[in-house]
Amino acid sequence: MEYKEIIAEVPNLFQVIPLTVFRKTEGVVFDLVNMDHLPKIDGIDRVIHDENALSPGSIGEVKRPWYMHPHQEDNLLVLNGTRHVDLYTPEHGKIESFEISPHKIKRNGELIYDGGVVLSTSVNVFHRIRTGSKGSASLNFAVRHPKFDMKTNFNIYKLDTNTDQYEVIRKGFKDQN
């Protein structure tokens, strides 16, 4: 099977990896993930959002905080609904916004691929999600690096994209069971 190349990429920020349609029949789409782009998976996270969910949610006066994983890469596959994903690093200097559904992805409002994708993000990327009006479901294929710590991996940050100043406003482990 021949796999398609990466659709879009900003080094040390993101890659958009297309799924390959293996089979389409009436009412069924069967896609394959190119495992060359995911040679190692340390965790698989199932994440289900209700309609219009924010992740992370508001904390105090910070209405749209951010996550940032210092020792984990994320590989997001949206299975149902729509996710609006913002990404930012001080090195890149601007927010990249994606709208991802099971069958297409837009970058900064422009359709970049008509088909299923994995949105892969590097370590140290600030990210946040807003779910569409019908809710959403996804899988994340996590790649964990040395020094990964579940207690700090989901810390929530206040980030000023004008000055690149950031601070932890909630310790991630406080939301874990």
Set out the residue ranges of the language-model regions:
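Histidine-centered metal-chelating micro-motifs
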Residues: G116-I129
